[in-house]
């Protein structure tokens, strides 16, 4: 019988594909239906964020952070304002810290709800996204009530937060937690034991601990490999060291483990939210939400009506902005997708000399070739869904 040479063929996945989670183009080299090589092409959403931030004052640069991982915008702001505060040596009052932690955890739930439900949709389940978006809508309303915006918040500011929360909002967030946990249990019962969901995710996209470290994994991706690495515990910032919560870790390092970790992290986030709400309504009911250093934080309207000095401070802060001492600083936070870092170099002026943003999704996407090789074409969407990428932060 004559020998037949079968040549591998290339296909384009995206950038219009709904499972590409944004404007990702992947060139897949296939042997039949088995993936031999994956070549991700990025840059289709590049907007030059880092360079734009270097042309703005520190206060004007904050909104750019919302447009990176736009699924959980406040978590990105958090890293940037912490970096500025580290340069300035500014302390945030306890009530301000609690509000920041509360909204960071709301952001984590917003992110994980979207991810686990769209991951289920990527493998054929159409009900979970409808349930997930119902809960996300409630959380988005909390965002809106806190700062007036559903998505691009611009709420975290150097020195604290833009404004205090009304007591009714804090109470409503507290009332949200128990119904949310019931809804999460329903989602868990629907998806987790599902035979088809398991077949599509178990033993797919496996990576060892050593490979995960080498590739710069963080967040859910490294915890899925069995490493209890969470910056909220290992390098606590704000008041996370005062919070009680557990770090879920996986043992098989596959897509299914990563899904399970995200489900458990939502429960832990709800636990942290409850602690924040209790303290904001109890021991920390009153007090400032921002630093009282008027060289960094603008004065209140009431002060400006009676004090010329306050009016001058306000004018200077919104025109020229504050100056930071020369130096460099790196601050990382445990964002929902992994370690989001901001490397800031100051030359003593009112603008950053250099801003480098460390996006976790960028490192995770690079491993797409390693994770997918040898799997079927259909598994590529499951793996892509489990690594949780958003192109706002990958392309910056």
From Swiss-Prot:
Record text on subunit structure and interactions: NDH-1 is composed of 14 different subunits. Subunits NuoB, C, D, E, F, and G constitute the peripheral sector of the complex.
Stated name of the protein: NADH-quinone oxidoreductase subunit D
A molecular function (GO) term: quinone binding
Domain of life (superkingdom): Bacteria
Chief location: membrane
Enzyme Commission code(s) on record: 7.1.1.-
Keyword Magnesium: no
């Amino acid at each position: 019988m004559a020998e037949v040479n079968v040549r591998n063929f290339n296909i384009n996945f995206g950038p219009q594909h709904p499972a590409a989670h944004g404007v990702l183009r992947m060139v897949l080299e296939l042997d039949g239906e088995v993936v031999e090589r994956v070549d991700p092409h990025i840059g289709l959403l590049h907007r030059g964020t880092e360079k734009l931030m270097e042309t703005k004052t520190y206060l004007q640069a904050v909104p750019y952070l919302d447009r990176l991982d736009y699924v959980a915008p406040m978590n990105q702001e958090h890293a940037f304002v912490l970096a500025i505060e580290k340069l300035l040596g500014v302390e945030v009052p306890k009530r301000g810290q609690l509000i920041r932690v509360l909204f960071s955890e709301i952001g984590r739930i917003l992110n994980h709800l979207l991810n686990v439900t769209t991951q289920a949709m990527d493998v054929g389940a159409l009900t979970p996204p409808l349930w997930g978006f119902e809960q996300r809508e409630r959380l988005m309303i909390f965002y809106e009530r806190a700062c007036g915006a559903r998505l691009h918040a611009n709420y975290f500011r150097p020195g604290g937060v833009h404004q205090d929360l009304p007591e009714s909002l804090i109470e409503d967030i507290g009332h949200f937690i128990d119904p949310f946990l019931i809804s999460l249990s329903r989602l868990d019962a629907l998806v987790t034991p599902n035979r088809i969901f398991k077949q599509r995710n178990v033993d797919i996209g496996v990576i060892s601990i050593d490979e995960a470290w080498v590739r710069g994994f963080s967040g859910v991706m490294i915890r899925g490999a069995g490493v209890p690495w969470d910056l909220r515990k290992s390098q606590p910032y704000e008041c996370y060291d005062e919070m009680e919560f557990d770090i879920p870790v996986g043992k098989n390092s596959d897509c299914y483990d990563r899904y399970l970790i995200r489900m458990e992290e939502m429960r832990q986030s709800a636990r942290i939210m409850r602690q924040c709400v209790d303290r904001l309504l109890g021991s920390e009911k009153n007090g400032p939400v921002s630093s009282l250093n008027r060289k960094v934080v603008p004065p209140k309207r009431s002060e400006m009506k009676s004090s010329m000095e306050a009016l001058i401070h306000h004018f200077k802060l919104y025109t020229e902005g504050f100056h930071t001492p020369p130096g460099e600083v790196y601050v990382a936070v445990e964002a929902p997708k992994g370690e989001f870092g901001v490397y800031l170099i100051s030359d003593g002026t009112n603008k950053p000399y250099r801003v480098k943003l460390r996006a976790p999704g960028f490192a995770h996407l690079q491993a797409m070739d390693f994770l997918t090789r040898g799997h079927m074409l259909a598994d590529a969407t499951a793996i892509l869904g489990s690594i949780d990428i958003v192109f706002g932060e990958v392309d910056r």
